[in-house]
Amino acid sequence: MRLSDFDFALPEGLVAQAPVTPRDASRLMVLAPEEGSPAHRGFADLPELLAPGDLLVFNDTRVIPARLLGHKASGGKVELLLCEPLEGGLGRRWRAMGQASKPIREGAVLTFDGLEARVDDVEGEGFYRVTLDRQGPELEAALGRAGRIPLPPYIRRAPDAEDAARYQTIWARAPGSAAAPTAGLHFTEPLLARLAARGIRRTAVTLHVGPGTFLPIRGDDLDLHRMHGERYEVSPAAAAELAATRARGGRIVAVGTTSVRTLESAWRDGAVAAGPGRTELFIRPGHPFHAVDAMVTNFHLPRSTLLVLVCAFGGQGRVLAAYREAVARGYRFFSYGDAMLLLRR
C-alpha cells in the first residue's frame, strides 16, 4: 500500500488559522452507509444525527504548554517539545523532541526561564529522554510561565491568549499532550446538554497525544512505517459503559482518531479492557474494526497517518472523494477546521 494513494490537492487558503465562534458553529460533513453522497450539516446538528442509546467517547487529555525555548549551559539556543510523560501525568521524566544549532549531548543541562531539563539519553532522529527539575503542580506552574501552546506548524502565527482556551477541549482533564485531540474542539456545554437530553451518553478515555499522531510518514511504503508509542488509559467505568452500550445495541461513537486508536488498541477478547497501555497501532485499510461504530473527526493533512485511518474506517475511495468535495465546497481543514461524522451502521 502506497502513501501516494492518500494524497489530495488542498489550497492553502482552506487551512484554518483560527477557530470559529462558538465552537459548534463549524460545518459537519456526514458520511452514512446508506447514502451515496455526503450530507452537509452544521456541527450543532449532531444530536439529530445520532440515536438515543449511542455513546460518545471523548479523549480527556489536556494539552500542556509543551514548547520550550531556552539555552544550553554554553549559551546556545535550544528548543524542546515535551512529547510523552514517562511516569504518567506531570512527572519529571519525559520523552522530548529537541533542536539546537549544535548537537544536544547526553548529560547536557537545558534551561527554560528557570525550568531545567537534564538530557539522560539521545535516542536519535531528534528525540531525547530528559529529566525535569520539578513535577506535579510546580511543573505545571513552570510550564505556564516558560512554555508555549504547541500549535501545529501549519497555523502560521504565534499562539495567543485565545489559543490557551480554544486549543483545548472543554472536558480536558489529564495533562500530558503535545497536541489537542481536535475533533473534541467543536463541542460546547449547550451541545452536550442537548445530546444528553436526547439520550446520547458519553464517557472518556485518555490518550496523551504525541509524535505517533502528528509526525509525517517517511517513504511511500506504508508497510515500513512505524508509529511512535503513545500512552493511554481506559478506566473501569469507561470499559463498563462501553460494554453496556454494546449489550443494549447502541453505537460506540469515537470522538477523534485518538479515541479510535485507544479503543481499538484496548480491545481484548470481545470487549474494551480497562487499564493503562502504550499503543503503536497504525490503522490502515484492511484493519478489522472491533470497538468503534462511528467517528467524529476533523479534515486531515494529505499523506498523513490520520487520513489513512479515516480511509480505513470509511473506505478509501469514498473518503478521498468526500475530501475532494470538501475542498470544492470550501470546508476548513486541520486542527481549527470543520468536521466529519462517519457512520458504519
UniProtKB/Swiss-Prot annotation:
Q: Which domain of life is it from?
A: Bacteria
The alphabetized list of GO BP terms reads: queuosine biosynthetic process; tRNA wobble guanine modification
* Pathway where this protein functions: tRNA modification; tRNA-queuosine biosynthesis
Q: Which UniProt keywords apply?
A: Cytoplasm, Queuosine biosynthesis, S-adenosyl-L-methionine, Transferase
The UniProt entry's GO CC annotations, sorted and at most eight, read: cytoplasm
Q: Enzyme class, one word?
A: transferase
Q: Which Pfam families match?
A: Queuosine_synth (PF02547)
Looking up InterPro entries in the UniProt record yields: QueA, QueA_dom1, QueA_dom2, QueA_sf
This enzyme's EC code(s) = 2.4.99.17
Under catalytic activity, the entry for this protein gives:
7-aminomethyl-7-carbaguanosine(34) in tRNA + S-adenosyl-L-methionine = epoxyqueuosine(34) in tRNA + adenine + L-methionine + 2 H(+)
Query: What GO MF terms are annotated?
Result: S-adenosylmethionine:tRNA ribosyltransferase-isomerase activity
Q: Where in the cell is it found?
A: Cytoplasm
Spell out the NCBIfam families in the cross-references. Answer: PRK00147.1 (NF001140), queA (TIGR00113)
Function of the molecule: Transfers and isomerizes the ribose moiety from AdoMet to the 7-aminomethyl group of 7-deazaguanine (preQ1-tRNA) to give epoxyqueuosine (oQ-tRNA).
Q: How does it assemble?
A: Monomer.
Entry's family note: Belongs to the QueA family.
Protein's recorded name:
S-adenosylmethionine:tRNA ribosyltransferase-isomerase
Write the lineage as a comma-separated list.
Bacteria, Pseudomonadati, Myxococcota, Myxococcia, Myxococcales
The gene coding this protein: queA
